[in-house]
């Protein structure tokens, strides 16, 4: 499938002040483990575990609400490739896909990116929460609000 963005258009979409745009464009050195026409995947400088990788689109999207359908579909294909490579090359037993949107959610660089984090036996538990039972009435209210918002 042809890219919906011509190369010239993608370059226009880069944010001159965005460090991830510069890394994705190859202007700042990084340990690149994968690259194609849409993405560059690099090892994280502050890894949660050995092999922690960031998938960076070469086009600038602030977060998942701005990413195009084509990029959204293809980022999961890249994540799957990386996950398989992590199992084969690094011997991890699993991996987490983490994608934060907005400061309140922990996004520190306002350029869409996905973390692929290898998980090893006996490794630190990093993705967890304390589930609390939900009340049926609250679920119904939240569900109605979300369905209404999805119709807009």
Predicted feature locations:
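HIT superfamily nucleotide-processing domains
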Residues: 2-152
């Amino acid at each position: 499938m042809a890219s919906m963005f011509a190369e010239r258009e993608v370059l226009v979409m880069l944010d001159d002040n965005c460090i991830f745009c510069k890394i994705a464009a190859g202007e700042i050195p990084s340990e690149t483990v994968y690259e194609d026409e849409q993405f560059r995947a690099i090892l994280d400088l502050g890894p949660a575990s050995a092999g922690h990788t960031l998938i960076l689109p070469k086009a600038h999207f602030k977060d998942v609400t701005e990413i195009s359908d084509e990029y959204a579909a293809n980022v999961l294909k890249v994540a799957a490739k990386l996950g398989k490579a992590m199992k084969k090359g690094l011997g991890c037993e699993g991996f987490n896909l983490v994608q934060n949107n907005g400061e309140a959610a922990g996004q520190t660089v306002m350029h869409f990116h996905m973390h692929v984090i290898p998980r090893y036996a006996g490794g630190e538990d990093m993705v967890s929460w304390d589930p609390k039972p939900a009340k049926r009435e609250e679920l119904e209210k939240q569900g109605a609000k979300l369905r209404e918002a999805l119709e807009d």
